[in-house]
Design a protein with these regions (language model features):
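Conserved alpha/beta-domain cores
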Residues: 1-48
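Short beta-strand/loop segments at the ligand-binding rim of alpha/beta enzyme cores
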Residues: 1-12, 69-81
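Conserved active-site-proximal phosphate/metal-binding subdomains
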Residues: 37-79, 85-176
Length: 176
């Protein structure tokens, strides 16, 4: 069996997912991952809401999701992701009712991560002012480190893929 672990960014999303799973499969998700607005990568919030600080905090989302689960009578563990920085953060969320946390960005600089050493160093050296919200190629807001590539995209330059490696869908690529 495969565990179902949907990522949610609100109690409303958790409620909808629980209702849908129950209606169609007569089960609830095995766990929820709360991904707050401080997460790296793709974000489940509007870009304006993120940049204007109009998103719920991880604490607020956790409280809402736990309330939805409690209302249903289900026993679904919840893990918090996005902006979890250290052991103090981990302990805080567990004390607030989370089963645990999920951390990703902190592990980019490890030997086990297959990212390039240049990218790893950029992550290690990044300061708060180096991070920005962009519109990703799939159209979602995403957190990224400012770079010459982003500056070129801001200037209107476009790029075409030269080679695909395990793409999930077809993309425009340069066959030259």
């Amino acid at each position: 069996d495969t565990l179902a672990a949907p990522i949610v960014s609100s109690g409303r999303a958790a409620r909808i997912i629980m209702k849908t799973y129950k209606k169609h499969y007569d089960v609830y998700p095995d766990m929820f991952i709360i991904e707050g607005s401080m997460a790296g990568g793709h974000l489940g919030f509007g870009a304006d809401d993120i940049t204007q600080g109009k998103t719920q905090s991880n604490d607020e989302i956790l409280s809402d999701v736990l309330a939805v689960i409690e209302e249903s009578g289900a026993d679904i563990p919840v893990f918090v992701a996005g902006g979890v920085f250290d052991g103090k953060d981990m302990a805080h969320y567990v004390n607030e009712g989370a089963a645990g946390v999920q951390i990703a960005t902190r592990f980019i600089a490890t030997n086990e991560c297959d990212a390039s050493d240049t990218f790893k160093q950029a992550v290690v050296n990044a300061k708060r002012e180096d991070i920005r919200i962009i519109k990703s190629p799939v159209g979602m807001p995403a957190r990224a480190i400012n770079s010459p590539l982003l500056e070129r995209l801001d200037a209107g330059e476009t790029f075409t893929a030269r080679k695909c490696n395990g793409c999930l869908t077809a993309c425009k690529k340069d066959d030259s």
